[in-house]
C-alpha cells in the first residue's frame, strides 16, 4: 500500500543520523559484520549495536534483522532505536520486513508508542506490518488500540491472518468482552482458521476467562489434535471456575493421552483436592508428580503439602516437606504458612522456630496464623518477639496488629498503632486505613470510626463502607446504619461482594431492618441474586428469627450449592424446626450435593434437639464410612451431649473408648454432670478425677 508524503514522514521519524563516529577505522563491511556477530554470539547485544552505530557504512539486511530480534529478546529499546537510526541513515527506503521487525522489537520492549508511530510513518505496509503493530498493542495491554487497528485493517482490505487474530484474542482476554469474543470466534471460522490449534486454544482460554465453560468445553472438543497447551488451559479454567471434579477428570484424560501437564497445572489440581478434601485423589496426583519428577518444584511441593494439611494428614505433610531437597526461604515460609492458615498454629510455630532464616513475610505469616485462629494471647507474645527480633515492619504487619486490637477490644492499643501509622505514612494505604476503621468499629468507638471515615474520603472504597456499616449496626443503631447505606449508594454502587458482606454482618449482630433494606435494594436495582447472596440472606433471616423469610428465599433458588444447604439446615436448628433437617438432608442427597462437616454438625444438633440417639450415632458413623469425612472435635462433642442429655451413659462409655483424642475440659464437665444426674458413679468418678488431673486416664 503506497502512502503519500514520504519525505515529510521520513523527516519526522526516520531521522538520518550522519554523525556516526568512525571509531572502528576504515575496515570493510565484512570486518564490521564479523565483530557484530562475535558480540551477538557472546550475548553482548549492546556492544554489537555500538559497533554497528559506529560504522560509516550499512550492513546486510539479514544482520539488521538479527539485531532487531536480539534487541527484542533482551528488551533493549535504546539499542533497537540505534539499529533503526543506522538502517534509515544508509537506506532511505528500508524494506518493509525490517521495519516490521523494528515494530516487533518496540512491542517486546514495552514501547508501544514507538511501535505505533513507526507503523504510521511507514511509506508502505504489508500484512506483517499490521500483525506486528496489533501484536505490540496486545502485548502491552492497549486493548482499545488493538481493536481499532483490527477494524482499520479490515476497512483497508487487508486480510487478517492467524497472527492478527491471536493478538486480538489476547486483548479480548484482558477486557473479557463475551459479545466481542463470539464475533471473533465467528470470524476465525469464516476466515478458515478453525483448524489452527493455537487460535482454538486461545478461544477456549478466553471463553473460560469469561466464565462460559460450556462454550469453552465445546470449542475444546472440536479441536482435532489438542496440544499440550490446550489440555493445560482447559484444566486450569475448570479449576478457576471451581469445577474441581471436571478439572480432575480432564487432568487424568490428558495423562492417558501421554500429555505432560505443566507444573502449574499439577499444583492447581492438587489445590482442587485440598479444597474438596479429596485425599485419595490427592495421593494419586502426588504419585504422578513424583513420577514426572516435578515434585521438587517449590510450587508443586507446596501444593502437595497443603493438600495433606487440609486433609488432616499432618505426618504425610511433614514428610513431604522434609523430603524436599532444596528448601529455600520461600519453601519454609510456604510450609509454615500452610500450617498457620489451616489453624495449626502449634505445628506452624514449630517450623517457624526451625527456619534457618526469616524475612518479614515469614513473621507476618506466623502472626496471621495466630490472628486467624483467634489466639490473641499468643499473638501478643509473638508481637513482643517481633519487636525484639526485627527492626522494620510493613503494611501487612500493621493490618494484623489492628486485627489483634479488634480481637481483644483494646482501643488504646489501636490508637497507639494509629499514631505509628500516621507518623510513618501508612495512613495512605487503603488496606491499612480500612483495617483501622474496622478496628474502631469492632471496639465500639463509633466517634473515632466516623472521624477516621471522613478523613479517608479520597481513599475509601466498598470495604470502608462495609466496616462503617457493620460497626454502626453492631451497636444496635439500625437507623443510622440505614442512613449510611443510603449514603453509600450515592457515592458508589455496592457490589455483590459488598452486599453479601453486609448481609453477613446483619446476621451476626443481628440487624433485621438493615438486612431487609439490603434485600429490598437488591430487588429494586435488579441485582441477580446468586447463590452467595442467597446464602447470606438465608443466614441473615435465620439468625434474625424470621425463618419463614429464610425458607422462601431458599425455595426461590434455581440452583443450590452446599453453602446454601448448610445455611438452611443450621437455620432449622436455630429456629426450633429441627424435624425439617432430616427431610432437607434427603433432598440434599437427591440433588447430588455432597455434605461436609458443617452439614453433619447441623444434623447432629437436630438429633440432640429431637432426642434421636441411635439416629445420631448412625449419622456420625456414616461421616467416615459413607462420606469419607473425618469427624472433628465438634462432632464428638455433639455425640457426647446427645448421650449425656438423654442418659445413654452405657453407650457413652463405649463411645469414649473409640475417641481418638483426650476429652477436653468442656466434654469432661458435661460427662461429670450427666453422671451425677443419672447416678452413674463409675464413669462419673473417672470424669471427676480426670478434671482434677493433668494426665490421661482410660475410661472405665
Swiss-Prot record:
InterPro entries: Pentatricopeptide_rpt, PPR_At4g14850-like_plant, TPR-like_helical_dom_sf
Name the record gives this protein: Pentatricopeptide repeat-containing protein At3g26540
PPR repeats: 95-125, 126-160, 161-195, 196-226, 227-261, 262-296, 297-327, 328-362, 363-389, 394-428, 429-459, 461-495, 497-529, 530-560, 561-595, 596-626, 632-662
PANTHER family, per database record: PENTATRICOPEPTIDE REPEAT-CONTAINING PROTEIN (PTHR47926)
Protein family (similarity comment): Belongs to the PPR family. PCMP-A subfamily.
Gene Ontology molecular functions: RNA binding
One GO term of the biological process aspect: root meristem growth
Provenance organism: Arabidopsis thaliana (Mouse-ear cress)
Entry keywords, A to Z: Repeat
PROSITE patterns the UniProt entry points to: PPR (PS51375)
Listed Pfam families: PPR, PPR_2
